[in-house]
Design a protein with these regions (language model features):
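Short, exposed "boundary/linker" segments that immediately precede the start
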Residues: 1-3
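Accessory helical-bundle/CTD segments and flexible terminal tails appended to RecA-like ATPase motors
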Residues: 5-195
Length: 195
């Protein structure tokens, strides 16, 4: 009879364990990001997509190939590798080319996090990252950051807002957006990134 009670309690333990595991997986599923392709991230402040300069890549073919590779990068690692390859072959990028690289880096990082629109408000310094995500997901993106960075980031009904420097040029705003997106991405728990 002791044996039958052990079997029952072990079955009960297994059932409880599976139920607990299922509930945890449901919670994790709610935290899933909805990544989108980088070329679908809208950037109203940039009506034209910045391109690599003639001074950096002389031939139209080279600019076209590199531009396509930047546009088609699936993640920020691919952008970083491409940038390293360009620097190895052609040296450090000039200002115009760096702007194009940062533009694609910004959209790629945004797409990885599910941000579908990035808007800059130059007068106030606000950068808005619009995303289709639950409040829980948006809060998780902020909660994982170091306190130093949390101060400048807030959750809104439409996504996240970063308070950056006001009245700066587009390159500075873009760099601030890239830095904010990179910090958010780097602070994410790895199980969220790979779901």
């Amino acid at each position: 009879s002791d044996w039958s009670s052990d079997v029952c309690s072990s079955d009960l333990g297994a059932d409880l364990y599976l139920e607990l595991l299922y509930r945890q997986l449901e919670k994790i599923e709610k935290l899933r990001l909805n990544p989108i392709p980088s070329h679908k991230v809208r950037t109203p402040n940039f009506p034209d997509i910045p391109e690599l300069s003639v001074n950096y890549l002389v031939t139209p073919e080279a600019r076209k190939v590199a531009g396509k590779m930047l546009t088609r990068a699936r993640n920020s690692i691919e952008i970083d590798r491409l940038t390293e390859s360009l620097e190895t072959c052609f040296g450090e990028a000039d200002t115009k080319s760096m702007r194009a690289i940062n533009f694609h880096r910004m959209r790629t990082l945004a797409g990885e996090l599910g941000v579908f629109k990035i808007e800059f408000y130059v007068d106030s310094g606000l950068i808005e990252f619009a995303m289709n995500a639950s409040l829980e997901v948006k809060e998780m993106l902020v909660d994982n950051l170091d306190d130093v960075y949390k101060r400048d980031l807030s959750v809104t009904s439409t996504g996240l807002e970063v308070l950056a420097l006001a009245n700066v040029g587009p390159e500075v705003s873009m760099t601030q957006a890239v830095n904010a997106l990179r910090r958010i991405s780097d602070a994410l728990p790895s199980f969220i990134k790979f779901m």
